């Protein structure tokens, strides 16, 4: 195998900002943000808008998650 062509596989914390859910797992995602985890170590932090903790399919609850105003823009454009 060639040297130095594979991404860095490391421990990363994913933070679902919608439900404030955090999980420590391994990933190749790169980020400049870090967070202090429960074990006292600092880990890279990746923020996500939706995960299984907030997705309606997994939670069984229907809720509208509009982070960029697309619903308001659509309703304004096609209002009668």
Swiss-Prot record:
The keyword Ribosomal protein is annotated on this UniProt entry: yes
Transmembrane segments: none
GO cellular component, as recorded: ribonucleoprotein complex; ribosome
PROSITE patterns per UniProt: RIBOSOMAL_L31 (PS01143)
A single GO molecular function term of this UniProt record: structural constituent of ribosome
Highest rank taxon of the organism: Bacteria
Alphabetically ordered keywords of this record: Ribonucleoprotein, Ribosomal protein
GO term, biological process aspect, one: translation
Gene3D superfamilies given in the database record: Ribosomal protein L31
SUBUNIT field: Part of the 50S ribosomal subunit.
Family: Belongs to the bacterial ribosomal protein bL31 family. Type B subfamily.
UniProt name for this protein: Large ribosomal subunit protein bL31B
Organism lineage: Bacteria, Pseudomonadati, Pseudomonadota, Gammaproteobacteria, Lysobacterales
């Amino acid at each position: 195998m060639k040297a130095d062509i594979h991404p860095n596989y490391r421990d990363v914390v994913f933070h679902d900002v919608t439900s404030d859910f955090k999980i420590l797992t391994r990933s190749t995602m790169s980020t400049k943000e870090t967070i202090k985890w429960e074990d006292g170590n600092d880990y890279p932090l990746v923020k996500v808008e939706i995960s299984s903790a907030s997705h309606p399919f997994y939670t069984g609850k229907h809720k509208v998650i509009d982070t960029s105003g697309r619903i308001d823009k659509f309703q304004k454009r096609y209002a009668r």
